[in-house]
């Protein structure tokens, strides 16, 4: 505790500017002034405190501020729900409905939705801060399987945990 893990993650994800040193990602020095800049560069962050809107659907949360639009500039809900369903299927959690309200999802399902949101941004690096702190042992195993799947797909994972057995998995 107190070693600067969260501060480092916030710098990498564009929440805070570094006061010293540099951030190099994919061989290039980066200066992110916002999380959206880090996201555009391929870095996504999942905070320990989930950042989902409980009154919105799973798909609306995944594509918040990036909802697909049609030629008239209106939200293309059909595409959004289909794209979200495909992402949920890819992660092996197709039992979560893209139309489900987040308030009706369990904590572990919300955590999986946060991962889905990061994957939807084509993240090359996924920063996870204590992702299992409120999950059961069964849910932890499932989440770690998804993390390993993402690693196999070439996504870098920065996984912060106080549980050493998770890090060694």
Language-model features and meaning:
Residues 1-169:
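Glycine-rich phosphate-binding loops of nucleotide-dependent enzymes
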């Amino acid at each position: 505790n107190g070693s600067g893990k969260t501060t480092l993650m916030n710098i990498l994800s564009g929440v805070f500017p570094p006061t010293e040193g540099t951030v190099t990602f994919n061989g290039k020095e980066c200066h992110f002034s916002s999380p959206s800049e880090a996201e555009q560069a391929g870095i996504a962050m999942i905070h320990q405190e989930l950042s989902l809107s409980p009154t919105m659907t799973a798909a609306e949360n995944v594509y918040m501020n990036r909802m697909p639009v049609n030629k008239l500039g209106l939200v293309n809900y059909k595409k959004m729900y289909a794209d979200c369903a495909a992402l949920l299927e890819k992660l092996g959690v197709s039992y979560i409905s893209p139309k489900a309200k987040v308030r009706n999802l369990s904590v572990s399902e919300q955590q999986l939705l946060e991962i889905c949101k990061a994957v939807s941004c084509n993240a090359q690096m996924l920063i996870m801060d204590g992702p299992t702190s409120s999950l059961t042992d069964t849910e932890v195993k499932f989440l770690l399987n998804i993390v390993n799947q993402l690693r196999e797909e070439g996504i870098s994972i920065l996984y912060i945990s106080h549980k050493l057995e998770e890090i060694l998995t």
